[in-house]
Amino acid sequence: MEPFTMHRGVAAPLLRINIDTDAIIPSREMKRVSRHGLAEGLFAGWRYLAGTDRSPDPLFVLNQPEYTGASILLAGSNFGCGSSREHAVWALKEFGIRAIVAPGFGAIFHNNCVRNGLLPVVLPMATVQALADDCAAAPATRQVTVDLRQLEVVSPAGARYGFTLGSEQRQMLLEGLDPIALTLKLASSIDAFQGADRLRRPWIHFDG
C-alpha cells in the first residue's frame, strides 16, 4: 500500500450531507470480480446524464474543468454512511482521490479508507466550507495540502487547520501498512508468546 505522508492537490467541493456508499458507487456498478475498473462507476448517478450512454453531466463538480484531476474531496457530514461495501473506497482510490475532508464519516467507511491508504480527515463543517471558499477564491490552483506528519490541512490562502487521527491508523497510513502488514510487524512478539504458551499449556498445542 502506498504510504501517505503529505499530499497537495486540487480539492473539489461536494458538500452534500449523508452521501452514502450507494451514491459513491451504485450497486449496478459492482458487477466485476476485480476491484479494478471501479472508477468509471464512481458517483455514476450524478456524474452522467440520465438516459444517456454515460454522457458527463457538466453540472457535476468532478466533471467541471477547474476540478480536473482533483485528488482531495471536501464533503458534507456523515460521508460514506450506509452499507459496508469496500468498493466505495476502491472506486475513490482508483479515481485518484487521496484524502477526504468532512465533518464526519460512516464508521465502517472510515476504517475502510485507512485500510486502503485513503486519508479521512475530520474537521468542522465551518472549516470545510472555509476550505471550499478559499479554493473558489484561488481559481488558478485550488490546491489544498494535507500533511499527515503534522496532522494539519493547509488552505490555498495558507490557513492551517489541525486534525486528529488514531495513532494506529496514522501509523498504517504513514508506513503504507494494511492490517496484515501491521500484524506482521508484531511477528517476533507473537512468536515469543506462542513459545512461552507452548511451555505453559502444552496440551492445547498440536504439533503432529
UniProtKB/Swiss-Prot annotation:
Pathway this chain belongs to: Amino-acid biosynthesis; L-leucine biosynthesis; L-leucine from 3-methyl-2-oxobutanoate: step 2/4
EC number(s) per entry: 4.2.1.33
InterPro entries named among the record's database cross-references: 3-IsopropMal_deHydase_ssu (IPR004431), Aconitase/3IPM_dehydase_swvl (IPR015928), AconitaseA/IPMdHydase_ssu_swvl (IPR000573), IPMI_Swivel (IPR033940), LeuD (IPR050075)
GO biological process terms, semicolon-separated: L-leucine biosynthetic process
Enzyme's top EC category: lyase
Alphabetical keyword list: Amino-acid biosynthesis, Branched-chain amino acid biosynthesis, Leucine biosynthesis, Lyase
GO cellular component, one term: 3-isopropylmalate dehydratase complex
An MF annotation (GO) of this entry: 3-isopropylmalate dehydratase activity
Subunit structure: Heterodimer of LeuC and LeuD.
Stated family: Belongs to the LeuD family. LeuD type 1 subfamily.
Annotated function: Catalyzes the isomerization between 2-isopropylmalate and 3-isopropylmalate, via the formation of 2-isopropylmaleate.
Name under which the protein is recorded: 3-isopropylmalate dehydratase small subunit
Organism of this sequence: Cupriavidus necator (Alcaligenes eutrophus)
Organism lineage string: Bacteria, Pseudomonadati, Pseudomonadota, Betaproteobacteria, Burkholderiales
Recorded name of the encoding gene: leuD
